[in-house]
Amino acid sequence: GADYISIMQANLKALKKTTEQEGTEIAAEKEEDTKTVQNGYFEDSAVKDRTLSDYAGEWQSVYPYLKDGTLDQVFDYKAKLTGKMTAAEYKDYYDKGYKTDISNINITDKTMEFVVDGKSKKYTYKYVGKHTLTYSKGNRGVRFMFEATDADAGEYKYVQFSDHNIAPTKAAHFHIFYGGESQEALFNELENWPTYYPSKLTGQEIAQEMLAH
């Protein structure tokens, strides 16, 4: 815990020199190509279709860890690293981003199960394509889109994943967007991006993952 954090603090100056990005992901220790893609800079030709199996697994929302203070160390670190916002401002920004009532999502290569207040809803999905968004600071992100084949999927009919990858690979964490209106309607959602990490991780382990990226 504390030792890891203090080591990260000691790396602040070095990190500032090696990364110019704006705080959402600190990827200085990644390979150059991966870092570039992770930061949202890539060629259109590099974007490939993906399957639901890239997201298969049991996942937990990080929102409870923001609420109970576990992630405060992450916001403190980001504030010191970037100087763009205070720790409190980062926490408020991520509160809006992480906010969700879906505590867990369990995914197979064909289905998604959403758990809200201990009750689950499970639907079958098909892949329907990918869409690249360009953000205000010039970087980009790819949404991988899935659609429920069940008639009663309601607000879970249209689902999009964003995991900072643009081609087939197993997701380490992801942001999810969902709704009952259309895929296009979800392209406009840039403020709320519920975020999920493997269910087996503790809050402290998730905080360390965030600091290491």
Where are these regions (language model features)?
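Calycin-type beta-barrel ligand-binding domains and close structural analogs
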Residues: 30-45, 107-213
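Aromatic side chains
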Residues: 4, 55, 125-127
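Solvent-exposed loop/turn segments at secondary-structure junctions
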Residues: 1-2, 66, 166
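Beta-strand cores of secreted/periplasmic/IMS beta-sandwich domains, seen most often
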Residues: 53, 58-64, 104-107, 113
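Sec/Tat-exported extracytoplasmic proteins
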Residues: 15-23, 56, 63-70, 97-98
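Extracytoplasmic metal-acquisition and chelation regions
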Residues: 1-36
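N-terminal glycine/threonine-rich, aromatic-flanked beta-hairpin/loop signature
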Residues: 71-126
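N-terminal helix-cap/turn-to-beta initiation motif at the start of protein domains
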Residues: 42-58
